[in-house]
Amino acid sequence: MKSLSYKRIYKSQEYLATLGTIEYRSLFGSYSLTVDDTVFAMVSDGELYLRACEQSAQYCVKHPPVWLTYKKCGRSVTLNYYRVDESLWRNQLKLVRLSKYSLDAALKEKSTRNTRERLKDLPNMSFHLEAILGEVGIKDVRALRILGAKMCWLRLRQQNSLVTEKILFMLEGAIIGIHEAALPVARRQELAEWADSLTPKQEFPAELE
């Protein structure tokens, strides 16, 4: 399996060379890929995983992600990295663009690493919401802000299809520091339309004359 991972690392270095010099090191039994000592991707069992971020949310809507997991004390831990499938490997321009999103988000997080706020200190953040975010690997304010409301909501919805639009509004409010009821009307409508676009519409047979 190591040989497969090394092949994937070398292929990633070739395809993503425009991002800069890509180095790798062992991490969690896998390999982290870095540019300027900033981790933006992982290679595990011969597969490349990109760091999820707000800008990659739309891609993950159209391509339901497979998340990177590893074992810790006998239980599976999910990381915020999604697998690059073969169709994405065949589209190098898109792969480079998504990888750049991941790198930029990682650099942004690195610049704010000196503060590690607790989720429970944010508006709209109930104990239950903090708990379910933790279950999908979102454990602090920095991760919430880097991923953005849409990506966090997608993570929750992938775990539980009954997650409502109200949770999306609560996440957005938590990120910008206001109660969900005080969200600007235009932003609330944009989020609602985005969430609605993900819900399959039920079709009814035409009525007979």
Curated annotation (Swiss-Prot):
Triggers of expression: Not expressed by conditions that usually induce expression in other bacteria, such as amino acid starvation, antibiotics or addition of chitin. Induces its own transcription by a mechanism that requires CRP, cAMP and CRP-S site in its promoter. Negatively regulated at the post-translational level via degradation by Lon protease.
Signal peptide location: none
Species in which this protein is naturally found: Escherichia coli (strain K12)
GO BP annotations listed: DNA import into cell involved in transformation; establishment of competence for transformation; positive regulation of type IV pilus biogenesis; regulation of DNA-templated transcription
Keyword entries, A-Z: Activator, Competence, Transcription, Transcription regulation
Family: Belongs to the Sxy/TfoX family.
Presence of the UniProt keyword Mitochondrion in the record: no
Disrupted-gene phenotype: Reduces both natural plasmid transformation and competitive fitness in long-term culture.
Miscellaneous note of the record: Overproduction induces the expression of the competence regulon genes including ppdA, hofB and ssb, although to highly varying degrees. Plasmid-borne expression leads to production of type IV pilin (T4P), the main subunit of the DNA uptake machinery.
Protein name: Protein Sxy
Biological role stated in the UniProt entry: Induces low levels of natural DNA uptake by inducing transcription of the competence genes (the CRP-S regulon) required for DNA transformation. Induction of the CRP-S regulon also requires Sxy-activated promoter (CRP-S), cAMP receptor protein (CRP) and cAMP. Induces CRP-S site-containing genes which are involved in genome maintenance and transcription or encoding transposases and toxin-antitoxin pairs.
